[in-house]
């Protein structure tokens, strides 16, 4: 248990270090830190319109979002409003500097229609939404490793409303080889896997 706890805390601290250092990271370093395993259909779908990604809380979605803005399309997503408001504003400005378009959501605030309108305005977008935590009463029960878990319905509902393809996104850290480590400016990289549902 201690070993697993130490690994989890190391991963969490790595995320915060990477996130806070990201604005000082070069474009070449961002591109070198992410290795993508993409569905063959993904680029074709993006040529037609936006795509929706159902994500879990894992890895560093800020780094992958910066990568996606450079390699796929502009990222349009929702961020939970934090208190104090100045902290939230700083997080939004940080993500916007990385190339993302952010819609803020306060507690109890309905954001779905605003997200639909934003998705119809411009694009195509990569629209990543966290699905492994339901903050509303409208989640759906799914089977997760033999147990029932409540997931957010937002990604599937948005894809259905806008008639967009839905993908799942996962990621994990990997140690980088000497050459890639040098290019990334970090011993760690992320493997991003995107598959259509």
Predicted regions and their residues:
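Negatively charged linear elements and acidic catalytic determinants
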Residues: 1-33
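Soluble catalytic domains of membrane acyltransferases
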Residues: 23-197
């Amino acid at each position: 248990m201690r070993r697993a706890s130490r690994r989890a805390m190391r991963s969490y601290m790595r995320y915060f270090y990477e996130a806070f250092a990201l604005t000082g990271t070069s474009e070449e370093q961002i591109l070198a830190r992410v290795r993508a395993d993409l569905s063959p259909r993904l680029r074709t779908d993006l040529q037609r319109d936006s795509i929706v990604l159902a994500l879990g809380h894992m890895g560093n979605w800020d780094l992958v979002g910066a990568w996606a803005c450079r390699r796929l399309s502009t990222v349009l997503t929702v961020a939970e409003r934090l208190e104090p408001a100045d902290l939230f504003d700083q997080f939004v400005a940080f993500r916007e500097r990385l190339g993302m378009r952010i819609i803020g959501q306060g507690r109890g605030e309905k954001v779905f229609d605003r997200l639909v309108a934003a998705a119809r305005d411009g694009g195509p977008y990569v629209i990543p939404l966290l699905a492994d935590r339901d903050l509303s009463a409208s989640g759906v029960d799914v089977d997760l490793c033999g147990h029932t878990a409540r997931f957010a319905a937002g990604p599937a509902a948005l894809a259905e409303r806008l008639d967009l393809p839905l993908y799942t996104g996962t990621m994990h850290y990997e140690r980088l080889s000497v050459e890639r480590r040098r290019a990334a400016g970090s011993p760690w990289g992320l493997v991003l896997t995107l598959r259509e549902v």
